[in-house]
A protein has these predicted regions:
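N-terminal beta1-alpha1 cap of cysteine-dependent amidohydrolase-like domains
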Residues: 1-109, 115-131, 135-137, 141-142, ...
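Residues in and immediately flanking transmembrane alpha helices
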Residues: 109-110, 199
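C-terminal and late-domain segments of enzyme folds
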Residues: 159, 164-261
Length: 261
């Protein structure tokens, strides 16, 4: 049986790619850390992989806003590759800065659960007489949520408890039924939907897979600044069935196989 191939995407400012690579390798995957330019230049092809992972850091120095420049590169220059990757049923995860990137690219939370008319219809093309593609039947990715400045107006660097949603359709969180304990480390982690309709849809579809909780060690989870990311449903992770965006830094608490000095 062939192993799962994972691409860990990096660019200027990414600083958690090696931790993410280590975690996937410990789970049995074959992992390549690939700079975005190698995809843009067609030296590497996204379709060669089964999982796309975008790790944390400060991509392009978080100029404009956290993750915005890399999000634009994905949406505007690799949009077709991402569509095919999604429609092939492959998986993706964005962690910390990676979540900011996927959200601002419009890939999460809406793109993965937006079904075209008929299997594979998203890739149908109207062909000219010369066989050149003219148009697609699906509009470009559209941003529905964002992650913005924390209510505390500061960089949050601490540990929090997260309460899972057991009925979530997300493949990444299957089997997680008890609260988990993870670090957060970001200045722009406040989850904001475009409008109340988007938020209600996420709730109805069980797409808010983790929420911050104070039921365990409340003094650790809730400081004077309130939730690290504000009060919008206390959302920390927003998935579709194939993809997951996580604000906490999961790669900073991967302990299996780590040898203590």
């Amino acid at each position: 049986m062939s192993k799962v191939k994972t691409i860990v995407l990096r660019t200027a400012g990414t600083n958690c790619d090696q931790e993410t690579k280590f975690a996937f390798e410990r789970c049995g995957a074959v992992v390549e850390v690939v700079h975005i330019n190698r995809l843009l230049n067609k030296e590497k092809v996204l379709s060669d992989y089964h999982i796309l992972a975008i790790p944390g850091g400060f991509s392009y120095g978080d100029d404009i806003a956290s993750g915005k420049i890399l999000a634009n590169e994905l949406r505007l220059r690799l949009g077709e590759d991402l569509r095919r990757f999604i429609d092939d049923g492959k998986l993706m995860i964005g962690i910390c800065n990676g979540f900011q990137i996927l959200a601002k690219a419009g890939v999460l939370p809406g793109a993965l659960n937006r079904e075209p008319a008929g299997r594979g219809a998203a890739l149908l093309q109207i062909e000219s007489a010369k066989g050149q593609p003219l148009a697609h039947d699906r509009a470009p990715f559209s941003q529905e949520v964002t992650l913005t400045t924390n209510d505390s107006a500061r960089f949050e660097d601490r540990w929090v408890h997260l309460k899972p949603a057991p009925q979530s359709p997300c493949v990444w969180t299957k089997g997680i039924t008890q609260p988990i304990f993870l670090p957060v480390a970001h200045g722009e982690g406040k989850f904001i939907p475009k409008d109340n309709a988007v938020l209600e849809r996420l709730k109805k579809n069980n797409q808010i897979v983790f929420r911050y909780t104070t039921r365990i060690y409340p003094k650790i989870n809730r400081l004077k600044s309130g939730w690290p990311e504000g009060e919008v449903s206390n959302a920390t992770s927003v998935p579709d069935s194939q993809g997951l965006g996580m604000a906490p830094s999961t790669f900073k608490d991967f302990r299996e196989g780590v040898v203590e000095a």
